[in-house]
Every structure is written in C-alpha cells, then in structure tokens.
Regions:
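Bacterial Sec-dependent signal peptides at the C-terminal "C-region" and cleavage site
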Residues: 1-5, 9-25
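Alpha-helical cap/lid subdomain in secreted, periplasmic
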Residues: 23, 50-60, 76-223
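A generic, residue-level signal for flexible/boundary positions that often mark functional hotspots
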Residues: 12, 29, 63, 71, ...
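Serine-esterase "nucleophile elbow" of acetyl-processing enzymes
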Residues: 17-70, 75, 80-89
C-alpha cells in the first residue's frame, strides 16, 4: 500500500511539474541599436507586437523584451551580449544590426569593415546557439528611402544585407529581410523618390508606418 501511495504521489508531482512547465512564457528578445531601443516606446515596433499579442489573447504565452542601445554596432552587441542577452535566458533572439556599422564609416569615421562585421556576427550567433537560443537574423533596412538606390550608403547596405542573407541560408537560421521589405514597400508608396517620410522620419528611424511594417515582419518570424 505504501508503495502504491508513493507511486501515485510521484505521478501527481510529475504531472504538476509538467503542467507548470507548459505554462512557461516563451522569452523573445530583440537585440540591436537605437531602432530597437526606440522600439519599446509607445507605438514602437516592440510595443506594437505586445499590443498585437494581447489582442490575440496570446500575452500569457510570450514575454517580449528589447535590448537596444543607440549607436551600437555588431562589436558592441558582442561585448554586451552576456549581460544583456544571455543572462535573460531567452528562447528566441532577433539580431537587428548593421546600420551604424555602415553609417558611421562616413558620419563618424568609425563603422565596421565588411570582413570584421562577418566575424563578429558569427561569434554573436554561435555563442547564443551554444546556450540553446533560437537566433533570427535581420537585415539593416535603410539609410535613406530613395527607391533608385541613389542613397549614399545603399552600396554598403546591400553588401552587408547580402552577407546576412547568405549566412542565414548557410547556417539554416531564420531571416527577416527588412532591407527587401522596405524597398518593396517604397517601390509601391514612394513615387516621388523621397529620401525620408515613407517608413522613416529621418532616413533611418521608424515612423508610424515603419514601426507597423517591422512589427508585422517580426511577428511572422516568431510564429
């Protein structure tokens, strides 16, 4: 009798633990620069994702976090990922970086050379994967919204975005191709070839429509 009671107690304890485990929220973290830093503000793309989850009745299934810092480049992400990402034990991490790696070459004389960008990027991804994190990579969107590729940094943005696309394919990891999504949107909504005001308010940072587009694309990859 004692043995049966012990067996029953063990069974119910296991069921309780499994039930508790099943209710654990999936942690999703967005890792990046000022665009992601602003994404947590009201109306930002991360805030919109949270709102959408609530409307879908899915808030209990996800914990959404932002870890963006203005001006960050890929090596900044490498240096702070232990503190700002790995310590949070996320299930999914979106890596959205590259604009400052390109932009700061001309604006500040810094930036990140193409070969170093790839090495740091791979190191960031590999370290996250070693902790069992699902990594989704994101191409840098725009530095200027002209649709004819006449923006000053379009050449480098295309180069770095192509590297990210190839890296994602070779390593079989998720990709959100915002470079492509933004260009396709601008082709349809920027007939006057404007430099800003379509999806950004200053050529880089997102306006209302930009945040909505990014939230939609990120959500697709989360599912």
């Amino acid at each position: 009798m004692t043995g049966k009671l012990l067996l029953l107690a063990t069974f119910f304890a296991c069921m309780f633990l499994l039930s508790f485990r099943g209710e654990r929220k999936k942690k999703v973290l967005f890792f990046g620069d000022s665009i992601t830093q602003m994404g947590v503000d009201k109306g930002g793309y991360i805030d919109l994702i949270k709102t959408d989850l609530a409307q879908r009745g899915l808030s209990g299934q996800y914990e959404i976090m932002g870890a963006g810092i203005g001006g960050n480049k890929i090596y900044d992400l490498f240096l702070r990922m232990d503190k700002d990402v790995l310590s949070q034990n996320p299930d999914i991490v979106f890596i959205w970086v590259g604009v400052n790696d390109v932009w700061h070459k001309s604006s500040m004389g810094t930036g990140t050379d193409y070969d170093k960008f790839g090495k740091f990027y791979d190191a960031v991804v590999k370290k996250m994967q070693a902790q069992g994190i699902k990594v989704i990579v994101v191409t840098p969107a725009v530095i200027g919204e002209r649709v004819d590729y006449s923006n000053a940094q379009d050449g480098d943005l295309n180069l770095y975005s192509n590297w990210i696309r190839k890296y994602a394919a070779e390593n079989q990891i998720g990709l959100v191709d915002l470079r492509k999504s933004f260009h396709e949107y601008s082709l349809a909504h920027n007939p006057n070839n404007l430099e800003q005001g379509i999806l950004t308010y200053d050529r880089v940072h997102l306006n209302e429509k930009g945040n909505a587009l990014v939230a939609s694309e990120m959500w697709k990859a989360m599912q």
